Structure formats: C-alpha cells, structure tokens
Amino acid sequence: MRPELSDYEHISAGKVREIYEIDAEHLLMVVTDRISAYDFVLDTDIPDKGRVLTAMSAYFFEQIDFPNHLAGPLDDERIPEEVLGRAMVCRKLDMVPFECVARGYLTGSGLKEYEATGAVCGVKLPEGLVEASKLDEPIFTPATKAEIGDHDENVGFDVVVKDLGEDLAERLRTATLEIYSQAAKMAEEKGLILADTKFEFGLDKEGNLVLADEVLTPDSSRYWPAEGYEEGKVQPSFDKQFVRNWLTGPKSGWDKNDGSQPPELPGSVVEATRARYVEAYERISGKRFADWIGSCV
C-alpha cells in the first residue's frame, strides 16, 4: 500500500520503496512493509519491516566512512508524521545504472554461476569451492538493475567499463569492496558473517560518488550467524530466505515457474520473518528496535 502524502508529488515506486519529490534538490524516500521474493511483490506485508530497513540504513550511513545521500535527520520536519521512522530526506543524484555487489562467500546466484563456469561475473575462482565457501578475497560482481517483475542480470566488469568508462567503473569497484570490508569487520565483531551485499551509488553535481538507497540491510545483504558456520551447508540467515523457503516448500502449493502470483503468507511466517529482521538490526547496532522512532502502519 502506497502512503498518500498530500504535500509531495509521488514520482516513482520500486518493489519496496516509494519516492516523492520535496523540491528541486531533495527527495523523500519512504520504505514500505512490502516484501518481494522471486521478483514478485507479495500480497502480505511484514509489519515494521520498512522501519527496520530505515533504522539499519541510518545506522550504517553513520558508521561507514563514505559520502551518502542523507540530507537531514531521521526526524526532519520535512518528513510527514505518518511515515516517521520509515522515511529519509535524500539528495537528488544521477544514479548509476548497476547494482554494485560484493561477495565474500559463495552462495546464491554466485554459486550457481561458479558451478556452471568456474567463475562469477568473469572473476575466475579456485576449483573445489562449495556452498558457503569463504573466498580468498572479496570480489566485485555487478548486476543490471531490473524493472519490477524482471530479473537482475549478473554482468562482467567489462560491461560496466563499456557503459560507464574505465574511471567510473574502477571507482565503483574500489568503493564497493572498501565499504564491504568495513561492514564485514563490523559484523564479525557482532558475531555475524556478512556473506554478500549490494550497494547503489549516484553521482552528485560535482561528479562525486555517493552511497544511496539502502545500505547493508537484510533486504540487500546476506547475514549469517558466525556460530555454527560450516562450509558446504546452507547457512541460517537474517534475511527473507525464510519467506523464499516457505514459498517453494510443500505447504504453499505454489510453483515459482508458472508465472502465478505467490499466495499470502501465513501468520507464523510473517511473525518469524519480522523477528529475523528485528534481530538483525539489534545484533548489528546494539540498540533496541523498540526505541526506534515512528510506528507500524
């Protein structure tokens, strides 16, 4: 459900976020409680999910040593009360048309590509790697930004160079890996493994690279508990994998390959998913989510 904000013009929508124009220089980014899986936006919301993602992004924007798009505090007077705690005032940027992905461990689409080719996005990897293998060094694996309902497509670094030029492509790769390394160290100190993550960047009027959108949330990242980590096994996670597993399990009755809309999630799955998101925020930040501003809508 899209928030109706009479003071601002709604200019775009994503799977989870709604964007409104404040003025010529600023946007209001509102994070809803929607959840997506397998390129579908589900009919069931996860209560407080938007607030958790906003809280976590705000925490990391403060901690990470890199320019970001925030243009005001989280209780900025320009944020309407009904979206307080799930909205940010952001600078307008010229957004880079690639997802910038850093992988420190092999899993997900990266594992599938490796099993087929021995490489991920053109980066050759050693033989014998398996599910959850730790890579010798984190790798940069960009992807195209897909429209709602389409798949992001992993691409090689050469594609980024061709589209954006060598200088900007190299800046993106360097920034992505540096930020990932900062965040992975922070996660490790909290007993978590940051397996992989994706960033979005934009350019300001001076051509400076700026970290934008969300950062290091359970929607954009794979966090695993360090305790019990074992190479070769699927790791428990603090993201929406729990929802994916239910959708593809026998209880849902849904076939992800037939093009039909996924079924509504049962209450137990909704509650467990919310709990995972909240736990991720609290473990990373050391703060209580109950103290975060705003209320569930």
Curated annotation (Swiss-Prot):
Entry GO MF terms: ATP binding; phosphoribosylaminoimidazolesuccinocarboxamide synthase activity
Protein name: Phosphoribosylaminoimidazole-succinocarboxamide synthase
Domain of life: Bacteria
Catalysis performed (reactions): 5-amino-1-(5-phospho-D-ribosyl)imidazole-4-carboxylate + L-aspartate + ATP = (2S)-2-[5-amino-1-(5-phospho-beta-D-ribosyl)imidazole-4-carboxamido]succinate + ADP + phosphate + 2 H(+)
Keywords on record: ATP-binding, Ligase, Nucleotide-binding, Purine biosynthesis
Organism (species): Corynebacterium urealyticum (strain ATCC 43042 / DSM 7109)
Nucleotide-binding as UniProt keyword: yes
EC number(s) from the headed UniProt entry: 6.3.2.6
PROSITE patterns linked: SAICAR_SYNTHETASE_1, SAICAR_SYNTHETASE_2
UniProt pathway: Purine metabolism; IMP biosynthesis via de novo pathway; 5-amino-1-(5-phospho-D-ribosyl)imidazole-4-carboxamide from 5-amino-1-(5-phospho-D-ribosyl)imidazole-4-carboxylate: step 1/2
Family: Belongs to the SAICAR synthetase family.
GO cellular component, one term: cytoplasm
SUPFAM superfamilies: SAICAR synthase-like
InterPro entries: SAICAR_synt/ADE2_N, SAICAR_synth, SAICAR_synthetase_CS
GO BP of this protein: 'de novo' IMP biosynthetic process
